[in-house]
Amino acid sequence: MLERLQQLLPPPADPVEPGRPDGWPAVERRLGTPLPTDFKAFTERYGSGTVDDFLYLFNPFVAGEDGNLLVETDRVLAGYRQTRARFPDRLPLPAFPEPGGVLPLGRTDNGDELYWVTEGDPDDWPVALLASRAALQELHRMPVTGFLAALAANHLASRILPHDLLGRPSHQFTPSAEP
């Protein structure tokens, strides 16, 4: 799937904070779970940055706190748990590390949040998208690179993402250390 994504959304020639294969064991120990292979390959090839200056995936190799997968996991899940305790009908999925719990993956400029749903093999984790301004959530049963490739090919159906993002004639990845 990464090959298809690279055709649709060319990676940067000089990625920002791409990490290395030998850095993942420490990240996975800290999180307490293996991460999807495609996400690791994406991070190593693309590094940090945004898709269309709108969508940012967290990266455990970011030097600062903002956008760092490890820091954002703690922050985002704390807020998720509080909101879920008050509005369990809006957030039916548990928070990681509960089985099938959500694990933060990224966010949009609109404040929408992307999560993995940690059910089964990490390479099979679907992507969940939660709207920031409405009680909407979507489950996309595909890996993160499949989600990005579907977005870049204009084949992603979403009631949460803006229509002008979904229908662009082309998409761009911009390397950046800041989300």
Label every PLM stretch briefly.
Residues 113-119:
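Short, surface-exposed beta-strand/loop micro-motifs that present aromatic residues
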Residues 110, 121-122:
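Short strand-connecting beta-turns/loops that link adjacent beta-strands
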